[in-house]
Structure formats: C-alpha cells, structure tokens
UniProtKB/Swiss-Prot annotation:
InterPro entries given in the database record: M3A_MIP, MetalloPept_cat_dom_sf, Neurolysin/TOP_dom2, Pept_M3A_M3B, Pept_M3A_M3B_dom
Keywords: Hydrolase, Metal-binding, Metalloprotease, Mitochondrion, Protease, Transit peptide, Zinc
Active site: E544
Protein's name in the database: Mitochondrial intermediate peptidase
Transit peptide: 1-19
Keyword Lipid metabolism on entry: no
Length: 760
C-alpha cells in the first residue's frame, strides 16, 4: 500500500509543493517494480520490458490463429457448433432437464458467436496485414448473417417463451439468469418474431432498408459542403497573422471573391479571427447547408424506422428503442431533458451575456447586441482542456502507472506488464497488461495498441474481445456431434477453452475478460524520447480505462450481462466518472514516479464561458433526436426535419435560428444513437452527482471505491441500473426509475468540464 499522511493546506499562492503532496493530502509513493516496468513498457523507444521466450502461439494465445486462413476455418467450426447448440435448444421442449438449461445454452450460443465476431471486428480495424483484415471482414459478415437468422428464429423464441411461462422454472433462475432471459426475449420481440410470415418478411426488408439508408446518411454527413464566397473587403483586419495574411494577400492579388470550403483550415481561421461578421455568417451558412437529396435521405431513414416500430406494435421508434433502457419511455426522456434545460439555461444565458459584452466592446455599441451562431468561435475561441493545476509533462508510461496506482487505492487492483508470446499480438507496438486483484489474482487482460501507424483506424476505441462468463456448467457433451465434422468441433472447443481460470474464493471456472485499447499516439523514439500526452489525450485514456475496468470487474456468470453489456444510457457512467478523477490534485499526485517533481498550488481556475453553451446545445440535439423518432414522423403528413429543427431552436434555444441552414443532415449520431442521444448527457449528470456525493471528498479512500465496485461495477448489466445508482447515492427515491426519477436526475447540474461530445 502507498503511505498516506495529511498536511495542513497553505493558502499562499507562492507556496511550492512537492508533486507527491498536492493540496490537502500527500501520497508518498515508493515506485514498485511494476510501476517502473509499466513506465518503461510505454516510454522506452525499444519497449524495454521483455522476457526471453521461445514459445510461439497465435492471436491472443489461440494457437490455431497463426494465419488468416485459420481464422476463416475457426468461423466454419463456430458455425458447426452453433448449429448443434441451436438444435439442442430446439429439442429442449421434450425434456424438463433441458428446459432448465435453455437460458444457459442461449447465453452459450451468444458467446460462441460473439467471441469470434468481436475478434473479427478488432482484426478488420487494427491488423496491419491486409490478408488478416480481409479475413476479419469475411468472418464478421459470415457470422453476423447467421446471428441475424437466430435473432428471428421462431423455434428459439417459442422455447424461451415456454421457459418464461413456467413459474417453477423461473423460480430456479438466479436474478442474473432471469435478466439474461429477459434480454433474449426482448430482442426476439423487437425482431417481429410473433408476427405472421408476410409481416416478418416486411420486417426483414425494412431492417435492410434502414441499414442502406443509414450508410447513405453517414456518407452524406461526412460529405464536403460547398464553399462560401468571401469578398476581399471582408478579410480586412483579420487577426490571424499567418494564414490570415496569406488569404488577404490572395484576395488583394486576384481581386476576386475567395472560395473557402467549410471545415478547412481557412474556414476555421475565419470563424475565429475575422472581425467582420459577414464572412463568418457566410461560412456558417455554407457549413450547415444541405442538398434536397441529403434531407430526403434522412427523412426516409426516420420514416422507415417509424414504419418498423409500427409493424411491431409500437407507436414510434423511440418507444420501441427505449423499452430496455433506464429511461423506459420517450416521455421520461423528455422529462429529463426538460429539467436539464431548466438547470442549464441560466448558465448558458449568463455565458451569452459575457460574449455579448465582448461583442459590444468590439463594435463600440451602446447596448448589448445579440450573439449569433457565427459569433461563438470569434468571441469565445475553443480552448483545449487543461488540468486543474500546472503539471510537468505527462508521458504515456506515467499515465498508466497513475491508473494502476489509482485502481490499487480504490479496488485493490493493479496493472502488471507481461510479455506477449510470439504471434500473440498483431503488431510489435501492442503491449499486454495483466489485471491483478489483490484477493483473486488474475482477473483479465488488457492489450494496449496505442501508437499511430498506417492503415490503423483513427480515434480512440475500446474493444471487449471476450466477455466474462462461468464455464464449468457448460455441459459441452450434451450438444452432440456431427459425423465428418469432428475436427471442426474440436477446433472450436479448443478456442473456447483458452483464457479460462478458477477464481480464488469463488465457485466455478470463469472465462476471463479480454480488452483491447486502440489509440493513435506518437511512438516514443530515441531522438524525441517518451510520448508526452496533451491533456485531452489523458482524459481519453481515463475514459477508455473506465470501460475497461467495468469489463474487468463486471465478471458475471452470463456473458450477455457481463461488463459493458448493459443499458445504453448506463454504459458511459463508469468512463465519464473516471474523467472526474482527473479534477483531483490528490489523484494527479499518483503520476509522479518517485516524488521528484514540484508544482505550484495555484490551479487552473480559468472557466470557459462557452462550456455551458456547448452543453445546452447538446441538450437541444438530444431533444431533436427524440422529436425525429416520435410518432409525428408518420402522423404528420407535412413532417419536415428542417422545420422541426427551426421550431425547436426558436422555442427552446438560446441562440437565434439561422435561416437557410439544415445542420440535421450532419448529425451523424442520429443513426448510431437513434432515440438514445440523451444517454451521454444522462450519464454525465449521474457521474457528476456520484463524484460530488461519493468520491470528491476523499477520492482514494478504499471504502468508497469498494462500495462503488460492489454496488455498480461488479453487476455489469445483470442488475437494474436504477437500483445500483440509488444504493450508491443512498437515494431510495430513485429506485423506481420512474418519471420523477428522470426529472430528479435532470435537476442535477452537470458540474463537469469533462463531457466532450463524441468520446464514447
């Protein structure tokens, strides 16, 4: 354990503190061997943490996955075993003993397919070898096609209905097993399983149309917008001395209007630096324009979704989607958003008044002018996030060391570097970490693929390649066999048995979780040294590690409710909460290897006035998402996405609507998060409350970490999230998760600077 001692707070801004003694408390950390190993692993240009190994294996320790063709063979083997298990479940109605195993076998069937599908998803996005990536794509498409057949399999649905209708069988199910059964049942119901054949075929057709329209919508969202025509005289006085001067010279030399494309560096410079309002107005309108075809694609997508919902007896796509979420109904979502608007609008208006005063001074006006949409970046230029106190440069290795120390304080869990065997990882940059619990030993693995390279997917991502589940009760022999396919069956069995462990002080054998983190940081080099992260990169790592820790601790008997397999409007809570820890100087002191750095007590007290404006804009977008997936899409013959956006902006917004704009065609989350865009705001509100009420006072206190671990993390998706949150906050009034509970969460101000849109 790291030694702790309390010291008196000294208020003088000139006082210099040791890095290990930030503000109220100091945590003197003697660097352990694991601390030094983890720093060396990520900061050394040659990845110094290496042990000699003569053992050769395949991806993730699966000896058969040593070449792309073997992966395709594994997919074939998986299909054979999945069909055998499907047939077994279908025969269960003739045996009570088999009926008792239906929920377990459905979960096994799901895991059998998902463990290969999730691996394929990673390989096709991260593997540098084109042959592997192609194989990954093939396997993904092949198994997803079979999965879609199972999702609409009437026989499986009828067997599950038989189980849930038998009270004596239901009594034998644990709460976790019953929750798993309900998830399968709801998924079947959403797939029009109980409709006549013709209507089921229509469901399949509409689902296919939605995928096609969704892809087209996303292509349109990312398509370049036409340029804005900027007159030379509008460039006079531009504040940017580099690119701005070049644009002014170009305008003077050509004596013609400049054509500036939205999203370009020139466009960004104009929005932030042009003192004349007109070029900013033109750029804004150009950036938020749409063609009739782009609008038509979105509206066809929304109407097709609405038709799908009506087909299965729901009044709207939002009603269909929210059934199994914390919110439960669109009305509850609007209750939450309405309360959140009431909480946030005063802060947004106060911020706008600050910007209005800046605009008044800029133009020398006698009264406060209106802030327009194109004024935001000029009067409040976007600033990168900053730590709460000045810090020395933070390297990738020190961040992972700090994460390991934080997890040790909170949960008794540490990250331990270990060598990957030859063939186990897809690139030499990938590093392997064991996740070690002080009582239970090894509980999972994290593979960190953190450095940029050609062909690698961009951005940060978290992949749960394999979920946790209990395996000693599987009864593989009961699945039967198939003459002529013995080798394939054995191949899949061997694949499944890797990563299984007996957990000390816990019944049974468990398949341990396996997580991959993908980022694109600069690789350390001999010339430049270790990779130093910007603060937003540190926040991203903490966010993704929140997901990873949920996967590690949420070790359930059923994979369908393990780790991050939980409600969409709950899954971001652990990751957003992790970002809050970065607001604590006490936590930041864990980044110091030996206590050799010093820093000033004076913190970063600058408050971005635009933060509340941006949060309010997110609330408006979440409201728009609900409107776009409401019954009005079909009930109103004149439904127009552009009109709805204008009406919402006029009635609820704080910045005037701009005519001739149609931002909705670039709102890409409408496809991936249709009717659930509120989720991120919802989890931000809960995370803010949890931080304030549970962690802020003493963020490294083990008792607090254990409470969070036991009341939230360990359940994964196997318990009602409302019960978890109400227990954690000692707020019994939330347990019902009704309309009033949603309103109550909406009344919690989102007290953070951590919620960056797009980090999921």
């Amino acid at each position: 354990m790291l030694a702790r001692s309390v010291r008196t707070l000294v208020v003088s801004p000139k006082t210099v503190f040791r890095f290990r003694g930030c503000l109220f408390e100091k945590h003197v950390s003697t660097a352990s061997a694991d601390d030094r190993a983890i720093v060396s692993l990520f900061d050394s240009p040659h990845a110094a943490f290496k042990y000699p190994s003569t053992i050769s294996t395949g991806l993730f320790g699966h000896s058969q996955l040593s070449h792309p063709n073997a992966f395709i063979s594994l997919a074939e083997a998986t299909l054979v075993r999945a069909q055998l298990l499907t047939d077994r479940i279908l025969r269960a109605r003739s045996s009570r003993d088999e009926l008792l195993k239906v929920v377990k076998n459905l979960d096994r069937l799901s895991d059998m397919l998902c463990s290969v599908i999730d691996l394929a998803e990673l390989i096709r996005n991260a593997h540098p070898d084109r042959n592997w990536a192609t194989a990954g794509h093939h396997v993904y498409e092949q198994l997803c096609e079979f999965m879609n057949v199972l999702n609409t399999h009437v026989g499986l649905y009828e067997v599950l209905k038989l189980v849930l209708a038998d009270a004596s069988i239901v009594k034998t199910l644990s709460p976790e097993a019953y929750q798993t059964a309900l998830i399968f049942w709801r998924d079947f119901e959403k797939s029009a399983i109980n409709l006549p054949p013709e209507e089921r075929q229509k469901f399949v057709s509409l689902s296919s149309d939605i995928l096609v329209l969704g892809r087209e919508f996303l292509e349109n969202a990312n398509a370049p917008r036409p340029p804005a025509s900027i007159k030379p005289e509008h460039m006079v006085g531009i504040k940017d001395k580099g690119l701005g001067v070049r644009l002014q010279l170009q305008a003077q030399f050509t004596r013609r209007d400049l054509l500036v494309y939205p999203g370009s560096l020139q466009a960004q410079m104009i929005m932030r630096s042009a003192p004349d309002e007109e070029p900013r107005r033109r750029m804004y309108i150009a950036a938020n324009s749409s063609t009739d075809q782009q609008i038509x694609t979105l509206e066809r997508l929304l109407k097709t979704r609405a038709e799908l919902a009506r087909l299965v007896g729901r009044s709207s796509f939002a009603h269909m989607t929210l059934d199994d979420k914390m919110a439960k109904t669109p009305e509850n979502v609007m209750n939450f958003l309405g309360a959140l608007i009431g909480q946030t609008r005063p802060f947004a208006r106060r911020a706008l008044k600050t910007l209005s005063a800046r605009k008044q001074a800029h133009h020398g006006l006698s009264s406060l002018p209106t802030i327009q949409a194109w004024d935001r970046d000029f009067y409040c230029p976007p600033e990168p996030p900053a730590p709460p106190i000045p810090l020395p440069p933070l390297t990738l290795g020190t961040i992972f060391m700090g994460l390991s120390r934080l997890f040790k304080y909170l949960y008794g869990i540490t990250l331990r570097p270990t060598e990957a065997q030859t063939g186990e990882v897809w690139h030499s940059d990938v590093h392997k970490l064991e996740v070690i619990d002080e009582d239970k030993g090894l509980i999972g693995w994290i593979y960190a693929d953190l450095f940029a390279r050609h062909g690698k997917s961009s951005g940060a991502a978290h992949y749960t390649v394999r979920c946790s589940r209990r395996t000693d009760l599987d009864d593989d022999l009961g699945d039967g066999g198939l003459t002529g396919h013995e080798e394939l069956i054995q191949q899949n069995l061997e694949f499944e048995k890797v990563k299984r462990h007996k957990i000390p002080n816990q019944d049974g054998v468990y398949q341990l979780p396996l997580v991959v983190l993908l980022c694109e940081f600069t690789r350390p080099s001999v010339l430049k040294g270790a990779t130093v992260l910007e603060w937003h990169d540190v926040m991203t790592l903490f966010h993704e590690m929140g997901h990873a820790m949920l996967a590690m601790v949420g070790r359930t008997e059923y994979q369908n409710v393990s780790g991050t397999r939980c409600a969409t409007d709950f899954v971001e809570l652990p990751s957003i909460l992790m970002e809050h820890f970065l607001s604590s100087p006490v936590v930041l002191s864990l980044f110091d290897l030996d206590g050799t750095h010093s820093l000033r007590q004076v913190g970063n007290t600058h408050e971005d006035p635009c933060h509340s404006i941006d949060t309010f804009s997110q609330i408006i977008l979440a409201s728009l998402d609900q409107i776009y997936h409401s019954p009005a899409v079909l009930d109103n013959s004149t439904f127009s996405t552009t009109d709805e956006l204008e009406n919402l902006t006029v009635s609820k917004g704080v910045i005037p609507h701009v005519p001739s704009t149609s931002f909705q065609t670039q709102f890409g989350h409408l496809f991936g998060y249709g009717a659930t865009y509120y989720s991120y705001l919802f989890d931000r509100a809960i995370a803010s409350r949890v931080w304030k009420k549970v962690f802020e006072k003493d963020p490294l206190k083990r008792e607090v970490g254990e409470k969070y671990k036991l009341e939230v993390l360990r359940w994964g998706g196997g318990r009602d999230p409302w019960k978890m949150v109400s227990k954690l906050l000692d707020a019994s009034e939330l347990e019902k998760g009704d309309a009033e509970a949603m309103r109550e969460v909406g009344r919690w101000r989102i007290e953070d600077e951590v919620g960056l849109p797009g980090r999921h």
